[in-house]
């Protein structure tokens, strides 16, 4: 009799994806983030479900319903803190996962990469609508400022904004629909994750060397299940440290005040994981130009496979491109810092220089470095 795990129609799929999957023998800890993102998604869906059982999406009661969850619901404070800080862990893992893809040339699996970029955009949309739900000051004004950006679209902009708002300002209709979006999007993300994995398993995983690993594969279980379990424990440790010891460290103090349309906070800024894009948006004095730059800062990921000029896939043996990659990383950290600063000198000019160098590095310098490294590899005698 054949083993059930190899014959049962459903268990067979799980077996081919997580147990008998042939994996390269040399993939490093940078390949852990896929499973960590899966774990983050599960944590967010579960904690979110329990929060939704007690939350009310009405402007009059939303803020107090969140307070009620934290005060009166059994372990409500823990569920809320895990959900809020789980989002930060999600984005931390996402950024590292994308960075890994760029460093090791994983973007050359174009279908997997493109679905990944769509996933990134969907997760960003989910986080944005979720941030509005507690109906604090920063929730309200963040929603107002970001949705207002759509009014920069010529001709249909204003109509589009009012259509999204469900009125002439961010109000009850907006909050209700944002709650609906925030509930449905994680399930769309889950479906996209399955498509992402489907395309990945068509080609098999990349590895640090960037060389075809077919000649040396090992089974996913037990080697990578145990490795992923270690990564998961480390991530859960960091998440619990955040949620239990400093749950409000990454939040904004303004969100402890209920939303007030008559009082604007001195500095409107999004959560830390959007600050790099927010800095790029603010660095252009023109509204439409800023919105286009904001979109380009994320959508540029889609053209990265087209900008690959090197004969080698990975950056492992390419010191010049490595240097540029880490400059790009430092540049993104700088943008994140600038996004949280007030709009005044010297922050304005630093933000503008960092924004220009962000696009310059990706579109021009890294492809040129690839060509130069090809030239350096050619025999000169």
UniProtKB/Swiss-Prot annotation:
The chain crosses the membrane at residues 33-53, 77-98, 113-133, 178-198, 226-246, 288-308, 320-340, 347-367. Heme b b562 binds at residues 83, 182. Heme b b566 binds at residues 97, 196. It is found in: Mitochondrion inner membrane. The keyword Zinc does not apply. Its main location: mitochondrion. It comes from the Eukaryota. One of its GO terms (biological process) is mitochondrial electron transport, ubiquinol to cytochrome c. CDD domains: cytochrome_b_C, Cytochrome_b_N. GO terms for molecular function: metal ion binding; ubiquinol-cytochrome-c reductase activity. The keyword Transmembrane applies. Binds 2 heme b groups non-covalently. Coiled coil: none annotated. Keywords: Electron transport, Heme, Iron, Membrane, Metal-binding, Mitochondrion, Mitochondrion inner membrane, Respiratory chain, Transmembrane, Transmembrane helix, Transport, Ubiquinone. Gene3D superfamilies: Cytochrome Bc1 Complex, Chain C. The cytochrome bc1 complex contains 11 subunits: 3 respiratory subunits (MT-CYB, CYC1 and UQCRFS1), 2 core proteins (UQCRC1 and UQCRC2) and 6 low-molecular weight proteins (UQCRH/QCR6, UQCRB/QCR7, UQCRQ/QCR8, UQCR10/QCR9, UQCR11/QCR10 and a cleavage product of UQCRFS1). This cytochrome bc1 complex then forms a dimer. Belongs to the cytochrome b family. Heme 1 (or BL or b562) is low-potential and absorbs at about 562 nm, and heme 2 (or BH or b566) is high-potential and absorbs at about 566 nm. This is Cytochrome b. It comes from Osphranter robustus.
């Amino acid at each position: 009799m054949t083993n059930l795990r190899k014959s049962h129609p459903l268990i067979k799929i799980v077996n081919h994806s997580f147990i008998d999957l042939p994996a390269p023998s040399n993939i490093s800890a940078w390949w852990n983030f896929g499973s960590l993102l899966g774990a983050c998604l599960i944590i967010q869906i579960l904690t979110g479900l329990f929060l939704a059982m007690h939350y009310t999406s009405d402007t009059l009661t939303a803020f107090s319903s969140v307070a009620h969850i934290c005060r009166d619901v059994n372990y409500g404070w823990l569920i809320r803190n895990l959900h809020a800080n789980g989002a930060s862990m999600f984005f931390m893992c996402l950024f590292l996962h994308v960075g890994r893809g760029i460093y090791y040339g994983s973007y050359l699996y174009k279908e997997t990469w493109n679905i990944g970029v769509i996933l990134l955009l969907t997760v960003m949309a989910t986080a944005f609508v979720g941030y509005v739900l507690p109906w604090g000051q920063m929730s309200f004004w963040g929603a107002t400022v970001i949705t207002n950006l759509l009014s920069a679209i010529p001709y249909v902009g204003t109509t589009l904004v009012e259509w999204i708002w469900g009125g002439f300002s961010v109000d009850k209709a907006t909050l209700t629909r944002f709650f609906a979006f925030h509930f449905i999007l994680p399930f769309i993300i889950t479906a996209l994750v399955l498509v992402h994995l489907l395309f990945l398993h068509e080609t098999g995983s990349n590895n640090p060397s960037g060389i075809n690993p077919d000649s040396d594969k090992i089974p996913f279980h037990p080697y990578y299940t145990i490795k992923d379990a270690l990564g998961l424990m480390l991530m859960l440790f960091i998440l619990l440290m955040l949620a239990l010891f400093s749950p409000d460290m990454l939040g904004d103090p303004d969100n402890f005040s209920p939303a007030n349309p008559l009082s604007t906070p001195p500095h409107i800024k999004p959560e830390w994981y959007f600050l790099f894009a927010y800095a790029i948006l603010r660095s252009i004095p023109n509204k439409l130009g800023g919105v286009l730059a904001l979109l380009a800062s994320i959508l540029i990921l889609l053209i990265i496979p087209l900008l690959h000029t090197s004969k080698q896939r990975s950056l492992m043996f390419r010191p010049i491109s490595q240097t540029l990659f880490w400059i790009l990383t430092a540049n993104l950290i700088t943008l994140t810092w600038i996004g949280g600063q007030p709009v005044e000198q010297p922050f304005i000019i630093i933000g503008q220089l960092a924004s220009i160098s962000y696009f310059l590095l990706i579109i021009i310098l890294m492809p040129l470095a690839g060509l130069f490294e090809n030239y350096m590899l050619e025999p000169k005698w």
